[in-house]
Amino acid sequence: MEWSHAFDAEILLPQADARWLTRPDRAVRTWSGTLGVLPGVTLIQCGGHFPGSAVAHWADGADGEGVLLTGDTIFVTPGEDRVTFVWSAPNRLPLPERAVRTVVEAVGPYRFDRIYGGWWQPVLRTGAREVLRASADRYVQFLRGEAAVD
């Protein structure tokens, strides 16, 4: 909260996660669905390991092809050729199928060719939209025990 006051900046909190807020403050602004935060930059509440999990879409990123900034909602794999999903990374718990489908559907209307994950993760540099859909389908096949191991 101190930094938001120092820079006169809002703290944007998805309404779905407001119950986790332990220090209410005038700087906190809740939102739901989508929220334009800058020209060409939209927050998309897509769910995931928290109901309010969100990603940012930057329409002009990747030379105008679009970028998703996903944090820990969508993980780019080390080989930079797939993405994956987790409910709890520290506990190695998978994200349920319904939540995976919700994430993919939420970003569906947006154009993007690149995905930047959180932390020091690799970057999916091209074809991200197609890779996301294919990776989600493969992930669900593994959840169901239907995937061929390659």
Positions of PLM-derived features:
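Metallo-beta-lactamase
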Residues: 2-147
